[in-house]
């Protein structure tokens, strides 16, 4: 609980946050079970994160109709991005996603225009990796950008 309170305080200083759905629910104390969550709930969660001080929000990992969805939310924009879902658990995917977001911002790219590119890049690289039973990791040594 202390750690979550600390993260909530940090929201006042963040220009952008990239929580997965679980993290976003914890940060906002949203009162629905995971299985009850719909797109409109995620938009409410993003609005609440915005009211807590963050300018731009990317909520990752919302599964719907065998797609993996990301919500981009800012003051004037609510936009959904979809990607095919690969039926495998990969450790570190969210971290790589956030790093690629940061990279796009440093390059001066418009975030809204970069999200689909980032999702496609992750999908293509995860799809090419060897799959093992249990939890897998992103194999960065095999990660290809711009092939």
Question: What are these language model-derived features?
Answer:
Residues 23, 61-65, 84-87, 119-122:
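Glycine-rich beta-alpha junction loops
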Residues 32-41, 106-116:
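Short, charged, surface-exposed loops that flank catalytic or proteolytic processing sites
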Residues 5-8, 12, 47, 99, ...:
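Residues on a specific face of well-ordered alpha-helices
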Residues 28, 105-106, 126:
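Hydrophobic residues in alpha-helical segments
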Residues 78-92:
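Short pre-catalytic strand/loop immediately N-terminal to key active-site residues, enriched for Gly-Thr
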Residues 112-147:
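Charged C-terminal helix
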Residues 1-78:
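Conserved phosphate/ATP/ADP-binding segment of small-molecule kinases
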Residues 88-111, 115:
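Short, small-residue alpha-helix embedded
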């Amino acid at each position: 609980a202390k750690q979550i309170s600390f993260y909530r305080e940090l929201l006042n200083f963040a220009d952008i946050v990239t929580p997965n759905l679980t993290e976003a629910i914890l940060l906002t104390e949203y009162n629905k079970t995971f299985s009850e969550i719909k797109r409109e709930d995620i938009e409410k969660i993003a609005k609440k994160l915005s009211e807590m001080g963050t300018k731009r929000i990317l909520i990752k990992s919302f599964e719907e109709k065998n797609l993996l969805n990301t919500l981009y939310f800012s003051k004037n924009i609510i936009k959904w991005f979809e990607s095919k879902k690969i039926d495998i658990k990969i450790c570190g995917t969210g971290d790589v996603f956030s790093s690629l977001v940061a990279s796009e911002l440093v390059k001066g790219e418009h975030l809204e225009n970069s999200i689909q590119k980032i999702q496609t890049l992750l999908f293509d690289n995860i799809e090419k990796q060897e799959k093992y039973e249990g939890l897998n990791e992103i194999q960065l040594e095999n990660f290809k950008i711009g092939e």
